[in-house]
Amino acid sequence: MDTLSDRFNALQENLMDIYESGRDDLETQIMHWQLLRQEQILFHYARKNGVMRLGYQPVPPLATSEAKAKDAIGMVILLESLQQSAYGKESWTLTQTSLETVRSPPANCFKKGPQNIEVMFDNDPENLMVYTAWSFIYYQTVDDTWNKVEGHVDYYGAYYFEGDLKVYYIQFEGDAARFSKTGRWEVHVNKDTIFAPVTSSSPAAGEGTDGAASVHTVSGSPLARGFSTTSVSTRKRTPPRRYRRKASSPTTTAARQKRQGEDTATRRSRSTSRGKQATSRGGDRRRRRRERSYSRDTSSSPDRGRGGRSRGGPETRSQSRSLSRSRSRSRSRGSSSRGGVAPDAVGKSVRTVGRDHSGRLKRLLDEARDPPVIVLRGDANKLKCYRYRAKKKHGNLVKYYSTTWSWVGGSTNDRIGRSRMLLAFQSNTERELFLKTMKLPPGVDWSLGHLDEL
């Protein structure tokens, strides 16, 4: 055990040298985390062998030393990957490469330039929340490349861009639901204020009071370097109605009524002429059918026409049966022509249309209902882990899971945004049941959709 204590003391000396040197290069930070990993390995070995203290340092439980060793291994992997990028020669301090900084929002990213954001709810100085935003954010893509982007702040939160994707890592709306009574707040960044004023136009009679509200920024001093605020056009996410009806003048109303009267007269004349043409065509068609049915009746063949009754004699059993069959056929044809797929039913079926003899129209109506899917967006490892857990929990609801995939540019092979995963369902009912019990990991978003065929 003396050898174990000597090794532990040597590790402590090396750690103290790093702390006292104050070096800000990645090589030193990687060495720091490797020493921390070795320290936890010594703790784990000592605990397994019944040693409760190394020098003056108590030995932690096995689970604690194991978890900290895994954290150190993960940090070494991240730092070595960052060292291979174009940002490996930048200045990196112990604080910037600490586990707490990496895990703070946005998680699993390196950050520089912290800025305090104060959000005041209900215009009450006592009802205040403080958040930490970042001037520069270093995030890793799915192909292990690092990108450096600027951080931004608007009325809804703090965000950055992953390509064209706007990623919020702080959202004020959640805390507003907990601490605000009116649902309004102001954002203070240094001496700059972002707030949502009252509506810019008064609502018309009979309408609600929620109008189009714009978010203004009042600047008392220039923002810190590399940190920007963004003004937002609306307070709510849904776009408000921008144009309203104006009261018409008597002259305009009279002219409009005159035009409407002329249009009505024109439509009536057109419909009358069409009706006459249809009547004449229908009369000729009925006349031909009567002649055809009369000739069939005289030859004692079953009648299939609409006007199948003979003029001179009573209606026979075969004639009444054919007449009812004819009416049922015309009624079914009319219902199929009038029926169809409602707009909200398009894309609602999960099965491919079979090769039955239902006719072209029914096949088109069946094909209008497509399989429902859910699109997940997030880190590739998180999506894979979620798929593994979801298969055990929602095995009967989800029909298919896709592998993780990404979009690429139209002219380049660079991946755009985060990874994707598709979940396909048998019906909308099963998808709704899945949404009620779905628990996504942090940083994973979802949206609904339909496919033509699975």
Curated annotation (Swiss-Prot):
Biased composition (Low complexity): 313-323
Renumbered residue ranges of the record's region Transactivation domain: 1-201
UniProt PTM comment: Phosphorylated.
Start-end of Basic residues biased regions: 234-247
GO molecular function ontology, one term from the record: DNA-binding transcription factor activity
A GO cellular component annotation in the UniProt record: host cell nucleus
TM region(s), chain numbering: none
Region (DNA-binding domain): 370-454
Family: Belongs to the papillomaviridae E2 protein family.
This protein's name: Regulatory protein E2
